[in-house]
Swiss-Prot record:
GO terms for biological process: methylation. Methylates ribosomal protein L11. This is Ribosomal protein L11 methyltransferase. It holds the Pfam family PrmA. The keyword S-adenosyl-L-methionine applies.
Length: 293
């Protein structure tokens, strides 16, 4: 089935109202895109943040009279003479197949591979984690996830417990188990993350060694030899008392989700209790690791 798309330049204040109206007049989907390549960081739980200059992109059936759509947008005040817009035909494709073709097995460190379930494992003798993009907040493609996976691959995890604080998809906890950890514990504020982690652990045959808790339900006095938290700089600093208490004496801590420009402030929050290693940067992101003093 072919489609036609309209792209409107808007603002964060107007974008959601325009989106609602486009759906009312027949759009089958509406998405938002940054029109100026401006990053957004640290939305609050349940919050949708938009860019100052936001493009609203609506998809319609190819038979739609797009001039009528433009007229309706003008009548409702969503489109004026100063609003840039573009209408274009969208080639019909097997979108599911194209999406799947974009994901390939990825290697992290010396031993670890993350592989989509529909792909053949490149090295059956390696440590292979099968994980599909989708529900999961982290599949190895983001630099912060990659930095954490490489760090875990470089540790001796045999017989140790690993806590994945802000577990999302569970990718870090599952990787730790496959790399030899005795037990892993995933903690998150989002019930959907707990569900995703459980499903991914079952797919990888490690569900019996993974304990999962919502943040408010985690047991008191929980500690582990290795703690990894791939969240964001603000929460990492705010939750320093909580995260630092999870690390056993002489235990290892790995932090990411941090912009390189934020590394200094995060290091300042943790350096009193941890001997920190050199910050490792990738693209605009970084990883901070250290040992509890």
């Amino acid at each position: 089935m072919a489609w036609v798309q309209i792209r409107l330049n808007s603002t964060n204040e107007k974008a959601e109202t325009i989106s609602d109206y486009l759906e009312e007049i027949g759009s089958v989907s509406v998405t938002f895109m940054d029109s100026q390549d401006t990053p957004i960081f640290e939305p609050l739980p349940g919050e949708t943040r938009l860019w100052g200059n936001t493009d609203v992109i609506a998809l319609f059936d190819a038979e739609t009279d797009m001039q009528q759509i433009v007229r309706l947008l003008r009548q409702e005040g969503h489109l004026d003479e100063n609003t840039a817009y573009k209408i274009e035909q969208i080639e019909d494709k097997d979108w599911e197949r194209e999406w799947m073709d974009n994901f390939h097995p990825m290697q992290f460190g010396k031993r670890l591979w993350i592989c989509p379930s529909w792909r053949e494992v490149p090295d059956p003798n390696a440590v292979n984690v099968m994980l599909d993009p989708g529900l999961a907040f982290g599949t190895g493609t983001h630099p912060t996830t990659a930095l954490c996976l490489e760090w875990l691959d470089g540790l001796d995890l045999a017989g140790k417990t690993v806590i994945d604080f802000g577990c999302g998809s569970g990718i870090l906890a599952i990787a730790a188990l496959k790399l030899g950890a005795k037990e892993a514990i995933g903690i998150d504020i989002d019930p959907q993350a707990i569900l995703a982690s459980r499903n991914n652990a079952e797919q990888n045959g490690v569900a019996d060694r993974l304990k999962l808790y919502l943040s408010e339900d985690k047991p008191a006095n929980m500690k582990a030899e290795v703690v990894v938290a791939n969240i964001l700089a603000g929460p990492l600093k705010e939750l320093y008392p909580v995260i630092s208490e999870l690390v056993k004496e002489k235990g290892n801590l790995g932090l990411s989700g941090i912009l390189a420009t934020q590394a200094e402030s995060v290091c300042e929050a943790y350096q009193a209790k941890f001997d920190l290693d050199a910050v490792v940067e990738r693209e605009e992101w970084c990883r901070i690791t250290g040992k509890l003093k």
